[in-house]
Amino acid sequence: MSEKKEIATFAGGCFWCMVKPFDEQPGIEKVVSGYTGGHTENPTYEEVCSETTGHREAVQITFQPDIYPYEKLVELFWQQIDPTDAGGQFADRGSSYRAAIYYHNDEQKQIAEASKKQLEESGIFKKPIVTDILKAEPFYEAEGYHQHFYKKNPDHYGRYRVGSGRQGFLDEHWRDR
């Protein structure tokens, strides 16, 4: 078996909720919370939350495509977000919480665009799919206390995932699929 590794980057609102779903899959080497898409080098959490850096909260995933292909990562990404929300995700509002797929090569771009089209045509959502598909930009790792938040603070993570409205939305749209 090949040890080929690739990188995938997804912005899906608060990065706390974006790590666990990917972390649990086979062939995923690591999932890092961070910031991408902005104009400030090495931004802090406070700077990103101030909406002045242009960054989005995101996760960067190192994966083995022979075990867990990029197509499956994109499919799992869609199942973690509200792709019809251009103003943020769930309780988190603002440009730093907007969803996006950041592609690292032409193949990823084509897969992401085809997947978005398929989702649009599926009828799962009544509103248009507005999630951006963008060329990957520099990714800056978030502060240590944000990394694997679901493991370090399981109770807080669980309350946040439900209280933000994320879990209810995902259950409503994906439970039976």
From Swiss-Prot:
Q: EC annotation?
A: 1.8.4.11
A matching Pfam family? PMSR
Q: Which InterPro entries match?
A: Met_Sox_Rdtase_MsrA_dom (IPR002569), Met_Sox_Rdtase_MsrA_sf (IPR036509)
Q: For this entry, list what GO says about its biological process.
A: protein modification process
Gene3D superfamilies linked to this entry: Peptide methionine sulphoxide reductase MsrA (3.30.1060.10)
Keywords noted in UniProt: Oxidoreductase
Gene Ontology MF: a single term? peptide-methionine (S)-S-oxide reductase activity
Q: Which reaction does it catalyse?
A: L-methionyl-[protein] + [thioredoxin]-disulfide + H2O = L-methionyl-(S)-S-oxide-[protein] + [thioredoxin]-dithiol; [thioredoxin]-disulfide + L-methionine + H2O = L-methionine (S)-S-oxide + [thioredoxin]-dithiol
The active site consists of 14
Question: At the top level of its lineage, which domain of life is listed?
Answer: Bacteria
Per the entry, what this protein does is: Has an important function as a repair enzyme for proteins that have been inactivated by oxidation. Catalyzes the reversible oxidation-reduction of methionine sulfoxide in proteins to methionine.
What is the similarity comment for this entry? Answer: Belongs to the MsrA Met sulfoxide reductase family.
- The name this protein carries in UniProt is Peptide methionine sulfoxide reductase MsrA
Organism for this UniProt entry: Bacillus velezensis (strain DSM 23117 / BGSC 10A6 / LMG 26770 / FZB42) (Bacillus amyloliquefaciens subsp. plantarum)
Question: Lineage, please?
Answer: Bacteria, Bacillati, Bacillota, Bacilli, Bacillales
